[in-house]
Amino acid sequence: RQAIADAGLSGVPRHRVEPARYVGMLEAHIEQGDWLESQDLHIGVVTSIVAIWQYKIVFEGVQNHAGTTRMAIRKDAGVALRRFCQRVEERFPEVCGERSVWTVGQISMEPGAPSIIPGRAEMILQFRDDDMETLLRLEATVRELVAEANAAGPCKASWETTNQNKPALMDQSIQSALDAGGAVYAPGKHAR
């Protein structure tokens, strides 16, 4: 209310959107990736908004002195995390979809000192797709890889879901209208 007053709009009646009058909304967007540019296209018709599924994966080992603990008896959580990341890169291409992407965008290790074997390592794994079956396959692969890490040892691995939303498929009639407009105003330079 204060912002409305500060803008000089106090007392101005509020206008409400009547949902029955609208099929959808359009949003002009600057491409954040390189797909349109790499294909020399001017217009891209959005078909969906991908879901983002995110997991925190934790490895528990034993913190110890890096200079005196023999390699054969180490329980290095950092090494366990590195192996897990490698397995993600090997396995995800086998189960992903054409548009799937994944990222390990955050890693932390405790205590985070160069001369101490990490006793705990944590990562955030995120993947995105617009197909629920693909998302479920990727999640099942995470579950399998955590079980595999626990079976291999020597560290204990656990995981928890931190974000899981649904893909949003765009209205087909709006896509078709935009596609038709692209054919007129950007022939050969547009795509869905």
Indicate residue ranges for each PLM-predicted region.
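Conserved helix-loop functional segments at active or binding sites
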Residues: 90-94, 148-151, 184-187
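Charged catalytic carboxylate motif
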Residues: 80, 141, 173, 177
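Conserved short beta-strand edge segments in small beta-sheet-based binding/regulatory domains
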Residues: 149-161
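Solvent-exposed, charged/polar functional surfaces in cytosolic regulatory/catalytic domains
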Residues: 87, 145-148, 177-184
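An extended, acidic, His-containing surface patch that forms the Zn2+-binding/catalytic region
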Residues: 158-192
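Midchain, well-structured core segments that form catalytic/ion-binding scaffolds
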Residues: 1-133, 163
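Residue-level detector of short coil/turn "hinge" positions at structural boundaries
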Residues: 11-14, 95, 156-157, 185, ...
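Short amphipathic alpha-helices in soluble, non-transmembrane regions
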Residues: 137-147
